[in-house]
Amino acid sequence: MKAYQESVNKYGSSTTLPKQAATGRFYTKKIDGRWWLVDPEGCLHLERSATSLRKGTSSRNKTAWNSKFGTDEKWLSTTQRELSEIGFHGTGAFCTGTYSLIQTHNASNPSSPLTLAPSFAFLSQFKSAKSYNYPGGSDDNAAGLVFYNGWTEWCELYLAGSAFADYLRDPNVLGFFSDNEINFSSNSSRILDRFLAISNSSDPAYVAAKAFMDSKGTQSVTDDLNNEFAGIVAEKYYKAVKEAVKKVDDKLLYLGTRLHGTPKYMEGVVRAAGKYCDVISINYYSRWSPELTTAIADWANWADKPFLVSEFYTKGVEDSDLNNQSGAGYSVPTQNERAYAYQHFTLGLLEAKNCIGWHWFKYQDDDGTDNSSKPANKGLYDNSYQLFPYLSFFARELNFNAYDLIQYFDK
């Protein structure tokens, strides 16, 4: 552990790799064909964090929290230390109720911060602010709201308002996610088909889809046309957010919308994200290994921007007291296999020159009534706030050697 701690700074960034310009903020840079994050001190940074850092709500969560911590500062100080001792140095999406506590911790402990990557829900917030309904009455069509009156102007107001005020110009904020898993299409439902099926012919989403088809001179939706239209929708979404960001804090990294499922394989969507996002975030499930020669190569070609794995995990089913009936992560027999899967998957990510890191989903296991009473073994921590020993050991071995492994892969 000492060797690792001496080779990284407070952000977990390398102090031995060539230093870059220090701007006081995180930014991205491509060096010799590999994408990097550069931290506020100018050190090259590989992102390794955990999502959903928040207090558990079950009775045993509360009992354990009170026994082990008792105060927010002890909780976060202990958590920061324990995570950094296994090579995790920050937080990701869904830290509901904790972001302000993390910032308070960071202000009191400037030498041992937890980075933040707060997540928002722009589309649903826009819908509520404007008292709109979802296009066609379905939240599957939420992306169609970008065609509704006021989208661009609302993004500017939202980013300039109270929701973002605490994060602007904070050096410990890696960046932000504007939404989660927007349904630009799925295996069973193409966005162009959905919009064309809206019964209200004056609905702006329907109007946009109809105009697109008219411009193509056809009434038959194909996968290629759907991909092109999805890209148009995505570009209208991302452009509004990015232009609003530039007006309030042009150094705040825009981490995209955590593409998942079908959208992450759609050229039109990824190209649009690459045009306006600083980092393309990917919730990476349904694969045991990163798709180095296919999807990951495509992302590099389509976007010319780095990607961040914003979610991945496996759950152990034989040695967990949870029913494990929820979640997109693969099931494995035990905690041992969770550990092996972590190393296997992240080794593949280290090999990818367009990957700038990952966020494990998530900080702590589900419990109690989580996920409609279908809790699952997703956490680095169990429900008593104890790190899973085998998973944390194997994660530490990989995380501590990550910078050396990158140099090995880049030879």
Predicted features along the sequence, with ranges:
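Glycoside hydrolase catalytic-domain groove-lining segments
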Residues: 218, 228-243, 247-327, 347
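Substrate-binding cleft of secreted/luminal carbohydrate-active enzymes
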Residues: 92, 173-175, 180, 310-312, ...
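Active-site-adjacent substrate/metal-binding segments within catalytic domains
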Residues: 1-110, 125-175, 220, 224-232
